[in-house]
Amino acid sequence: FHRGHPEYYSLQIKQPERTRKAVDYLRANPHRLHLGTIGLDLSDASKMNDIDQHLDLWTGKIDSKFTYDKQTYHIETVCDPGLDCIATNITSDGNIGVVFSFAYPTGGHCDDACRWDADKLHNTTLKSEKNSAVITRTIDNTLYYIYVSWKGNAEIIQTGRNKILLKSKGKNLSFSALFQSNSDEFGISEKSGITTKIPQIPDYTLCAKASSERWYSYWTEGGFIDLGNVKDKRATELERRIILSQYLMGAQEAGNIPPQETGLT
């Protein structure tokens, strides 16, 4: 641990095998599945400057500002607390394109779970309507869906076997992306992957409101350690870490049981 002396720490139990497997069930995901990457269609990182990004723990919103090729970008991103849904509002002087990229899982342990050189081992299909679309993903025996809706003048197209582009024709794009494994809610045929009914999902404004209300409740109804009167100069940093840890707990451990250790960020 780079402290200049040996230190002892506990390891997970390895024997007997049944006990080890029970520990692994809570500790590790046997087949990590990367559901997708959503990002701006900006290919040259060297053209990006004046980066200013911060996470507002009080509302759960990530606010990002930067310039790309001398064009300004402002991106606001939130997550709906009750759905597997993210929502983003983008304003820019330049071109606005959002890429949905999908990779095959690696099955590894200490990587990002993405194998980008195995396009033929999985498949992505797109069905679009006015201001909405359903992306159907097939990976081995796994089938899941991403429902996308947007506001503004934009079009969505498939640019590769496992790549989708949502391109705005204006200076603003607001969209939501809902990940869903149960096709019944979408009215999707399990065999064809074709949707018969595209439902409404919350837009950016509604997601931002739900996120803000959820985090307000989390911070005002819970408690935390106040180190404001502690004279030790390390108190401020310790308090910052406590608050950040509580945020991560609220964001990642809201289920009935703790998530697998290898699934944490």
Annotate each PLM feature.
Residues 1-265:
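Aromatic-residue-lined binding/catalytic grooves and analogous aromatic/hydrophobic interfacial grooves
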